[in-house]
A protein has these predicted regions:
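Long non-globular sequence segments
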Residues: 2-12, 237-240, 249
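Exposed substrate/partner-binding surface patches
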Residues: 14-78, 99, 112-122, 201-204, ...
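Papain-like cysteine protease catalytic cores
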Residues: 45, 54-72, 101, 105-255, ...
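Conserved aromatic-histidine-acidic binding/catalytic patches
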Residues: 78, 82-87, 93, 119, ...
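Residue-level signal for mature regions of secreted extracellular proteins and peptides
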Residues: 83, 236-239, 294-297
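Active-site nucleophilic cysteine motif
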Residues: 83-98, 127, 166-177, 374-378, ...
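Cys/His/Pro-rich metal-binding microdomains
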Residues: 84, 241-244, 299-302
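Carboxylate-rich, divalent-cation-coordinating active-site regions
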Residues: 90, 243, 325
Length: 425
């Protein structure tokens, strides 16, 4: 693909300079600063044809990347809004769009109680205010103009140096930062440190009955460590450590807000079993791999009180309402491992409790185009909670995909999957 880099770079520099200058002027006007995302972009910006402009992070265009997809225009989709790439922020835009398509987040931030919380003076330096305003602005009906998330980008850069400046980043890193930061801010102030206390409690009481430990952990969590983030994204798993000498087992419960599957290791395990046809692994194979025991060669058993051989594995105990799956490909040749997944996901064979409530449907996919997570280009495919159709978000460009097909969704490298319980919402 031939691109005039000089002209592309000139257009991008003009765009960024114009927009940054505009925001500097906007921020000096208190009345105009109240709504940080809903505004008319400068005339000079609107004159730039985004459909024909290469993107900052990778100089890749959606028409080239997805020319085989069955895509139609979104002229009738006035509830959709894109996000402008403001210097290698495709990683941020794709994550925000996936969050924005979770209707429970929108409902939470629109509630009077949350709006009051957002207006309190002592909360004005918190990330959840900018995040909530951005989510609400993305669903402004009858306004399909793209949003410019400069202030949100500036905020996360000030809070975490990893996201400072025009540097490409890994979407996974921003996802984990947002989840934990919002949970910490929206959790009750008196209970912020309870998570570490609970982990210490579970580690110190390994000899407790497994069921009793589960009940104790869940009760403490529900009473002391809840937020909208934990309600949506937190699940519970446990690590079983077993002595191969006396067969005693110790259990340690902990919360999780996403799962990471190392695709190269999953493929290697599949090869050892002789089940390899190509370099593709399925989500089922990822969950099966996650439950394989790993050896402990220098293990001290507190029951038989001696050094012995042991093994350990981690199992899912309670599933979250929205499960986030990160597909870690590694670098180099490992990056060529492919993933196969469906729109529906049944996890009843992999969870300890509430098996009847373990069915999920896909609502968002972050895909990556490049050879490592921190370079290349990120795009999001999201299912609209309004019309039920799928849309491709390539920064400011939105294109309709209509329905889920593997041909559409396995394009590029699917990297982060968002699944929602079918009985939830």
């Amino acid at each position: 693909m031939m691109i005039d880099i000089k002209n592309a770079a000139s257009s991008i520099v003009d765009l960024v300079k114009t927009s940054v200058d505009y925001f500097k002027n906007l921020r000096s006007d208190d009345s105009g600063y109240k709504m940080k995302y809903d505004f008319s972009l400068p005339k000079k910006f609107l004159q730039i044809n985004l459909d024909n402009m290469p993107f900052i992070s990778s100089f890749l265009k959606v028409t080239e990347l997805d020319k085989k997809l069955n895509i139609s225009n979104n002229k009738d989709s006035n509830h959709l809004r894109g996000l402008v790439n403001i210097a290698s922020t495709c990683y941020m835009n794709s994550i925000i769009q996936c969050f924005a398509h979770i209707k429970e987040l929108y409902i939470y931030f629109k509630k009077d109680k949350t709006q009051k919380l957002m207006s309190e003076p002592y909360n004005q330096d918190k990330l959840f205010i900018l995040f909530g305003e951005l989510i609400i602005s993305l669903w402004k009906i009858d306004d399909s103009s793209p949003l410019y998330p400069y202030i949100f980008k500036e905020k996360i850069g000030n809070m975490n140096p990893l996201f400072r400046g025009p540097i490409p980043n890994d979407a996974k890193d921003l996802l984990t930062f947002i989840l934990m930061q919002l949970h910490e801010e929206l959790n009750h102030p008196n209970n912020i440190n309870n998570f570490n206390q609970m982990n210490n409690m579970s580690n110190c009481n390994m000899q407790m009955n497994k069921k009793a430990m589960f009940n104790s952990f869940v009760n403490d969590f529900q009473h002391n460590y809840r937020s909208i983030i934990s309600e949506l994204f937190f699940g519970l798993n446990y690590t079983e450590t077993r002595c191969l000498c006396c067969n005693s087992a110790l259990y340690n419960y902990q919360t999780f807000n996403f799962l990471i599957f190392p695709l190269a290791q999953v493929l290697n395990n599949k090869m050892q079993l002789g089940n390899v046809i190509d370099n593709t692994v399925t989500l089922d194979e990822c969950f099966q791999y996650n439950q394989i025991y790993s050896p402990l060669n220098d293990y001290y058993c507190t029951v038989c009180r001696q050094n012995s051989q042991g093994k350990y594995a981690t199992f899912l105990s309670v599933l979250p309402n929205i499960i986030i799956i990160i597909l870690n490909r590694g670098e180099g040749l490992q990056y060529n491992v492919k993933i196969d997944f469906d729109e529906n996901l049944d996890l009843k064979n992999y969870v300890e409790y509430f098996k009847e409530d373990s069915f999920y449907e896909l609502i968002g996919v972050v895909s990556h185009y490049g050879q490592s997570g921190a370079n290349g280009h990120f795009m999001a495919r999201c299912k609209s909670p309004i019309d039920g159709f799928w849309y491709l978000y390539n920064d400011a460009i939105i294109q309709k995909l209509e329905y889920f097909t593997k041909e559409n969704f396995l394009q590029g490298n699917p990297y982060i999957l968002f699944y929602k319980k079918t009985k939830f919402g």
